[in-house]
């Protein structure tokens, strides 16, 4: 048995029957050819978007494919090919250092580049799908395929790579197109307010502001186990919002292009009185109600029980189902 304690940011002490890393497409293909994936398997990135509910009875695979390669460049933009095992925030830092615009609002999001393309990570008005041009993969038969971005089925925190039928499709590289021309996204959260503290706006300053905002709201997984936002913000028809506004006139919301609205799940959880509350060794964070934390010694089942209780409260008060953004393993 192999401990996965260092491979999940929730800090859940669970075990896998076997654990295997690979550092290249060739190594992955060799594992496949040797029959290593004939038993149950799970492919993970940085473990920052997982909750292990129990030990994993099978093989856990982890990519260590590295590298950031410029494949095309002109005066206006740059195309880069990035290994799935590159730490996401290291890639963001690299982009900012080189003056490439696009990733900066996604600073400090935990995890790795491969998982960013699977999950369609997003923050502060930016989603990674808007930067991706293609995703390179290998399937369980050892066959390589490149998915153009419009083949990836991207939606809010979703892609075709999350579907059960694509469980055996492994992301190996992600290709991005980034701008070399000044292009900022500032109208989200408290970004503009925080920028007033600085005499000018630059990429490094915006990255610092994003990091400061995140650190002020979100606990450090190295200190208190968590997986960032545990729940997705629900998207509802405008009619549902208007009905809720009768009872909750101050309910916050964000307009979407298709006429629907997104309601902050954290606000609803807070309205249900859960912020800062614990259920055994698991708790709702006292600064950001979207975040569930391991106060120490929690099992995955403890966090899941808290999640279920929070969801039931929101459903009872608002008539809305909120769903985990975190992937539940072993439920």
From Swiss-Prot:
Active site: 157, 229 (proton donor), 325
One GO CC term, this protein: cytosol
Subcellular location: Cytoplasm
Biological pathway: Cell wall biogenesis; peptidoglycan biosynthesis
Record-listed E.C. numbers: 1.3.1.98
GO biological process: cell division; cell wall organization; peptidoglycan biosynthetic process; regulation of cell shape
Entry's Gene Ontology molecular function annotations: FAD binding; flavin adenine dinucleotide binding; UDP-N-acetylmuramate dehydrogenase activity
Enzyme's top EC category: oxidoreductase
Catalytic reactions of this protein: UDP-N-acetyl-alpha-D-muramate + NADP(+) = UDP-N-acetyl-3-O-(1-carboxyvinyl)-alpha-D-glucosamine + NADPH + H(+)
Cofactor needs: FAD
The FAD-binding PCMH-type domain, residue ranges: 12-181
Keywords tagged on the record: Cell cycle, Cell division, Cell shape, Cell wall biogenesis/degradation, Cytoplasm, FAD, Flavoprotein, NADP, Oxidoreductase, Peptidoglycan synthesis
Protein's job: Cell wall formation.
Similarity comment: family membership: Belongs to the MurB family.
NCBIfam families: murB, PRK00046.1
Protein name per its UniProtKB record: UDP-N-acetylenolpyruvoylglucosamine reductase
Species name: Bacteroides thetaiotaomicron (strain ATCC 29148 / DSM 2079 / JCM 5827 / CCUG 10774 / NCTC 10582 / VPI-5482 / E50)
């Amino acid at each position: 048995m192999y401990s996965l304690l260092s491979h999940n940011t929730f800090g859940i002490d669970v075990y896998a029957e076997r654990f295997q890393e690979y550092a290249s497409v060739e190594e992955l293909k060799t594992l496949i050819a040797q029959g290593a994936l004939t038993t149950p398997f799970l492919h993970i990135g940085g473990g920052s978007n997982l909750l292990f509910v129990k030990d994993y009875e099978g093989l856990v695979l982890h990519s260590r494919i590295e590298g950031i390669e410029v494949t095309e460049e002109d005066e206006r933009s740059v195309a880069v090919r990035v290994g799935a095992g590159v730490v996401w925030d290291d890639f963001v830092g690299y982009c900012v250092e080189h003056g490439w615009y696009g990733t900066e609002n996604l600073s400090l999001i935990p995890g790795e580049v491969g998982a960013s393309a699977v999950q369609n990570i997003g923050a502060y008005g930016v989603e990674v799908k808007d930067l991706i041009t293609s995703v390179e993969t290998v399937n369980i038969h050892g066959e390589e395929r490149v998915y153009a971005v419009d083949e990836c089925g991207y939606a809010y925190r979703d892609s075709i790579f999350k579907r059960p039928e694509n469980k055996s499709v492994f992301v190996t590289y992600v290709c991005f197109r980034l701008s070399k021309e000044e292009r900022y996204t500032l109208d989200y959260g408290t970004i503009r307010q925080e920028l007033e503290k600085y005499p000018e706006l630059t990429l490094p300053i915006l990255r610092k502001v994003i990091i400061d905002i995140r650190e002020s709201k979100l606990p450090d997984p190295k200190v208190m186990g968590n997986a960032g936002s545990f729940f997705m913000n629900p998207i509802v028809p405008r009619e549902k919002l208007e009905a809720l506004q009768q009872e909750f006139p101050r309910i916050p919301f964000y307009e979407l292009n298709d006429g629907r609205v997104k309601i902050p799940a954290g606000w609803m959880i807070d309205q249900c009185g859960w912020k800062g509350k614990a259920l055994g060794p698991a708790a709702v964070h006292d600064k950001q109600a979207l975040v569930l934390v391991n106060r120490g010694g929690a099992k995955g089942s403890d966090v899941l029980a808290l999640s279920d209780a929070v969801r039931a409260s929101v459903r009872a008060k608002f008539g809305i189902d909120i769903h985990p953004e975190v992937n539940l393993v072993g439920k």
